[in-house]
C-alpha cells in the first residue's frame, strides 16, 4: 500500500489522480490533500478518501470547510504553509505535485526535504529552480517521477538504455488550437477560443500555455533537468493527433516512442505504480482508427514563446524563473481580457530583456527572481 499526499487535489491532475486511486484501493491510500479554489470538491474528497490532513487557500476557506465537515474531521490548515505541511506529512510515501505555477515550488521542496518521492506534474518547479531541486533530490535520495505525458513518454522510452547512447529527445506538441491560424489573426484571438484545446482536457493556465506553445517551452526546460540533456539535444515536433507522446532518438538512428490515447490518467498511473503498471480506465489505442500520424516543425515566428523558452534555458541563471513568472502574469491578464493573445509572449520577452540575471543558490534567491519578474510584468501590462 502506497500512501499519497496530493498538492492541487481539486484541479485537473488532482481529479485524475484520485480517479486512479479510486480504481486501486488495495494499492493506494490518501494521507493528505491540498486544494486551491474548490472547497465543495475538497469536502467530497474528504468524505471519500478520509485524509488525516487537508489544506485550503485561506483562513476564510478554512472556516467555511470546518463548518461543512461530516463525521470525518481531518486537521485543516491554510495558505502556502498549509500546503507545505501537506507535502511533508508523516505517513505519506509519495507527493503528487500538481499545484499550478510557481506556487508549487515551496511545497515540493518541503516534500523532497522530508524524504518523499515526487510525482511531478508541476513543471514550473524545475523551470524556476531546476538546479536547486535536482541537488535536493540527490541529497535526500528520493525519486522524481514525471507526470507530464511527454516526460513520462521519454522516461519510458529510456528504460534499458545508456545516457551516452542518446542522440536527442523529441517532445511532441499538438500545436494547439491556432496551429493553422495566420499570424495577423492571432492578435484578435480571445480567451474563449484559446481555451478550446483540440486534444487534451486541462486547466485554464496550461491550456493557454499550450495555445502559445509556452507549455512546450516549459517542458523543454523541464526535460533538461529531468534527463540531464543540454538544449542542443532537445527537439520539438508538432504532432496534431497527440498519439505519440514523445520520442528518444539513439546514436544508431533508432527512435523509440511511447504511444497512447491522450488521457492524463496514463502517465499519472505510471508515476504512482512505477516500476509496475496498473489499469487506468482509459480506452485502448486502435491504430487502424487513428489511421494517420502527421508531423511538422513548430513555427517559432508565429509562436515566439517556444523560442523564448529555449533562449532562457541556454542563458541559464535566473532567466528561466523570470520567463515563467512573467508568463504567469501575462496569461492571467489575457484571461482577464487586459491584453491580447500575442501580448503574452511580448510581455515575457520585454521582461526578460529588462532582467539583469544572477546565479541563484538558495530557494530565497530563486523566489526573489520570481517576484521581480512578476512586478515587472505587471508594470509592463499597466
Swiss-Prot record:
InterPro entries: DXP_reductoisomerase, DXP_reductoisomerase_C, DXP_reductoisomerase_N, DXPR_C, DXPR_C_sf, NAD(P)-bd_dom_sf. 1-deoxy-D-xylulose 5-phosphate binds at residues 123, 149-150, 174, 197, 210, 215-216, 219. This is 1-deoxy-D-xylulose 5-phosphate reductoisomerase. PANTHER family: 1-DEOXY-D-XYLULOSE 5-PHOSPHATE REDUCTOISOMERASE, 1-DEOXY-D-XYLULOSE 5-PHOSPHATE REDUCTOISOMERASE, CHLOROPLASTIC. GO terms for molecular function: 1-deoxy-D-xylulose-5-phosphate reductoisomerase activity; manganese ion binding; NADPH binding. Its cofactor is Mg(2+); Mn(2+). Pathway: Isoprenoid biosynthesis; isopentenyl diphosphate biosynthesis via DXP pathway; isopentenyl diphosphate from 1-deoxy-D-xylulose 5-phosphate: step 1/6. It comes from the Bacteria. Catalyzes the NADPH-dependent rearrangement and reduction of 1-deoxy-D-xylulose-5-phosphate (DXP) to 2-C-methyl-D-erythritol 4-phosphate (MEP). One of its GO terms (biological process) is isopentenyl diphosphate biosynthetic process, methylerythritol 4-phosphate pathway involved in terpenoid biosynthetic process. Its EC number is 1.1.1.267. Belongs to the DXR family. It catalyses: 2-C-methyl-D-erythritol 4-phosphate + NADP(+) = 1-deoxy-D-xylulose 5-phosphate + NADPH + H(+). NADPH binds at residues 10-13, 36, 122, 124, 203. Keywords: Isoprene biosynthesis, Manganese, Metal-binding, NADP, Oxidoreductase. Mn(2+) binds at residues 148, 150, 219. It comes from Chlorobaculum tepidum (strain ATCC 49652 / DSM 12025 / NBRC 103806 / TLS).
